């Protein structure tokens, strides 16, 4: 590359080339700093994307790692995945557990889901379910569907129930299963159960009270006419 002597660019001893002029025009990237207004705010500075909602766990499948929560205000069933639960170790929810969360649309377009799920106080850890699936840690307890107890055995090898009869794992009775257990209904629908019990008591009281037969009415009317 040819070089030329440029006045003001050298002290007479150093030669100056066009390449030097190009380098002089390049910005000084090292000294370039973002101003305060140009900095991207951190996550802590960002406002919450949506309001914080509150609800309770409707059910949660600990084996598959997902379930649903019921929103307190709308009563909507919101999908929840274990990856969105604020807890350490095995992540799950207990049935009826109180939670708070944010809501967003699901990526597959099938309704909405709860995320950043924690206790009623934001950031508070969750209790989770006592039921754990059998995995590498065989000592983890799970609920047997035959005896209703938390143990390390499965229902097909239950040592506590020798017959083929199933046991309600809600109350332990052999007369019914958990799906129709009155204790389960009383726990989750107390107002409806109380109304049904009150109606049954009223009908029982009517049946036990003495009633006046048609013959008694005719006899009473006959006595009144004779007088």
Curated annotation (Swiss-Prot):
Effect of substituting residue 11 to A: Reduced ced-3-mediated cleavage in vitro
InterPro entries named among the record's database cross-references: CSD (IPR011129), CSP_DNA-bd (IPR002059), Lin-28_RNA-binding (IPR051373), NA-bd_OB-fold (IPR012340), Znf_CCHC (IPR001878), Znf_CCHC_sf (IPR036875)
Disruption phenotype: RNAi-mediated knockdown in a ced-3 and ain-1 double mutant background reduces the percentage of animals with developmental defects including impaired egg-laying and production of ectopic seam cells. RNAi-mediated knockdown results in the precocious onset of tail tip retraction at the L3 larval stage resulting in over-retracted and shortened adult male tails (also known as the Ore phenotype). RNAi-mediated knockdown suppresses the male tail tip morphogenesis defects of mutants for the long non-coding RNA lep-5.
Region spans: Disordered: 1-27, 181-227
GO biological process: cell fate specification; negative regulation of gene expression; negative regulation of primary miRNA processing; nematode larval development; neuron maturation; pre-miRNA processing; regulation of cell fate specification; regulation of development, heterochronic
Chain positions of all zinc fingers (CCHC-type): 143-160, 166-183
GO cellular component: cytoplasm; nucleus; ubiquitin ligase complex
Keywords per UniProt: Cytoplasm, Developmental protein, Metal-binding, Repeat, Zinc, Zinc-finger
MF terms in GO: enzyme binding; mRNA 3'-UTR binding; mRNA binding; mRNA CDS binding; pre-miRNA binding; primary miRNA binding; zinc ion binding
Compositionally biased region (Polar residues): 1-17
The record's account of how the chain is modified after translation: Cleavage by caspase ced-3 during larval development probably induces lin-28 degradation.
Induction (UniProt): Negatively regulated by the miRNA lin-4 which causes degradation of the mRNA encoding this protein. This requires a lin-4 complementary element (LCE) in the 3'-UTR of the mRNA encoding this protein. Also negatively regulated independent of lin-4 and this is counteracted by the action of lin-14. Positively regulated by TGF-beta signaling.
Domain called CSD: residue spans: 52-120
Residues passing through the membrane, by range: none
Subunit: Component of a complex at least containing lep-2, lin-28 and the long non-coding RNA lep-5, which mediates the degradation of lin-28.
Function (record text): Heterochronic protein which controls the choice of stage specific cell fates. Regulates the timing of the second larval stage events (L2 events) in the hypodermis. May negatively regulate the larval to adult transition via the suppression of the microRNA (miRNA) let-7 during L3. Through this regulatory role, controls the timing of the sexual maturation of the nervous system. Also has a role in the fox-1-sex-1-mediated determination of sexual fate. Plays a role in governing the developmental timing of male tail tip morphogenesis.
Protein family membership: Belongs to the lin-28 family.
Protein name in the entry: Protein lin-28
Organism of origin: Caenorhabditis elegans
Lineage: Eukaryota, Metazoa, Ecdysozoa, Nematoda, Chromadorea
Designated gene of the protein: lin-28
